[in-house]
Design a protein with these regions (language model features):
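N-terminal phosphate-binding or glycine-rich loops at protein starts, especially the Walker A/P-loop
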Residues: 1-52
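Gly-rich Lys/Arg/Thr-decorated short loops/hinges at beta-loop-alpha junctions or inter-strand turns
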Residues: 3-7, 68-83, 142-152, 179-182, ...
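Short, ordered loop/turn segments at secondary-structure junctions
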Residues: 10-12, 39-45, 79-80, 114-115, ...
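Short glycine/serine/threonine-rich phosphate/pyrophosphate-binding segments
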Residues: 14-24, 46-47, 91-95, 115-123, ...
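Glycine-rich oxoanion-binding loops at beta->alpha junctions
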Residues: 49-107, 116, 155, 169
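Accessory alpha-helical/coil subdomains and C-terminal extensions
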Residues: 100-102, 108-113, 119-134, 138, ...
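C-terminal non-catalytic interaction/assembly regions of soluble proteins
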Residues: 257-411
Length: 411
């Protein structure tokens, strides 16, 4: 009798993470899986035996299509850090997970997520090998941060980049209507890698002069020099629009947002909660230059804008889910699917497999050779990299003028 599969979603959601879920589900069913279970709220929910049978939820082609076009995590998410299984306390957690997976007759385990989720897959695969388990553990990449190693880019990034490029164009239009001195600072997600903030450069084109300054976390930040640059820019044009990463840091390693408020909150993986960078900088500029300012935080909007997804991104998100299932059924375990770019024009991409050890707890940064000399703008090399990822659209299915989503009441 065919073994069952189980799939979970973890970490921050994206606009296309459910397309990867659809890819895993359909690929498993095509390959003869018994039931396909979903973890409700990831591994944390699984430890509480909170699961659903996806076969009972995704009954029609329309259900699958709705799933692909529904943003955020259909199964719910978590930020649970698995302990070290080499300790007595930690091993008890793995023993419980093994017991639950055994009860469900699981042969294939998929986790859709970013760096921390790949850490989870790596630990489970290692423990599985230790106890002689025949379960195949596979990682499916997802993160708007685009900071996963070995993959050319990560599903979720293309749609977030598209959203950022679009809203930056619209913010620039709004910021220039009065002809008076004004500084608009837009805060964009990105703790240690500036891929999302770099996407603000996509706004530039024949119909838009683009943002005036980009501040990446890869470049040490100096508040005084920042204010001086703004002052120089305002001598040339009254309205300035700046894109700044939430994670810009001073030379001593402190986050800029810490200059305004102590950042005490951390998640299970030890990541500080970052917010307030744009607000601090806007207040500083207003005080020192006696000019009007506005701060805008894109916040969760950049990761859940299902009305503005990239068709390329959705297609590839589905593709990596299917590739993970294919690999698991072929006997692979402890690996992640990566996207390998073949060419830019025409844009072509394929998939490959990499050991989790090459991915987990590592970060891919924006290459500084793609940034101009004074670190305030992106060069054509970045545009050539990013533009193919935002191409084409896949609009939501609208009902009475609003996007129609599929959802699980259990989550």
């Amino acid at each position: 009798m065919a073994k069952n599969a189980i799939v979970g979603q973890s970490g921050g959601p994206t606009s296309v993470i459910n397309a990867s879920l659809a890819g895993v589900y359909e690929s498993c069913k095509r390959r003869g899986a018994g039931k396909v279970y979903g973890m409700l709220h990831g591994v944390a929910g699984l430890l509480e035996r909170r699961t659903c049978v996806l076969d009972d939820k995704l009954k029609t082609a329309l259900d699958i299509e709705l799933l692909k076009r529904t943003p955020s995590s259909y199964l719910g998410s978590c930020r649970y850090k698995l302990p070290d299984w080499h300790t007595a306390e930690g091993e008890a957690v793995y023993q419980k997970l093994s017991e639950i997976l055994g009860e469900l007759d699981i042969g294939y385990f998929f986790y859709i997520g970013g760096n921390d989720s790949m850490d989870t897959i790596g630990k489970l695969a290692d423990y599985g090998a230790h106890i002689g388990s025949d379960i195949r553990f596979m990682g499916v990449p997802k993160t708007i941060d685009n900071d996963l190693m070995v993959t050319d880019h990560t599903p979720g990034y293309g749609s977030a980049a598209k959203y950022i490029g679009v809203v930056m164009k619209e913010i620039i239009r709004d910021a220039t209507v009065y002809g008076t001195k004004y500084v608009t600072i837009v805060e964009i997600m990105g703790r240690n890698a500036g891929w999302l903030t770099a996407a603000a450069s996509l706004a530039r084109g024949e119909d838009c002069e683009g943002v005036d300054m980009i501040c990446l976390p890869e470049v040490p930040f100096n508040v005084d020099r920042f204010v001086e640059k703004v002052e120089r820019m305002q001598k040339e044009k009254p309205s300035i629009v700046i894109a700044v990463s939430e994670g810009v840091k001073l030379a001593d390693g402190r986050y800029v947002c810490e200059l305004a408020d102590d950042v005490h909150a951390v998640d299970a993986f030890g990541h500080k909660a970052l917010t307030g960078t744009a607000r601090f900088l806007a207040n500083t500029v207003a005080r020192r230059l006696d000019t009007k300012t506005r701060c805008i935080e894109l916040s969760t909007l950049q990761r859940c804008a299902g009305h503005l997804t990239s068709r390329t991104d959705i297609t590839e998100a589905y593709q990596v889910g299917g590739a993970a299932a294919k690999a698991a059924f072929e006997g692979h375990t402890g690996e992640m699917v990566a996207l390998d770019r073949i060419s830019n024009a025409p844009y072509q991409c394929t998939t490959s497999l990499h050991p989790i050890s090459e991915v987990a707890n590592l970060e891919k940064k924006v290459p500084l050779e793609w940034v101009n000399a004074d670190h305030t703008a992106m060069l054509p090399e970045f545009l050539a990299y990013a533009m193919p990822l935002i191409q084409a659209e896949l609009t939501p299915i609208y009902v009475e003028g609003l996007p129609h989503h599929i959802y699980l009441p259990e989550t």
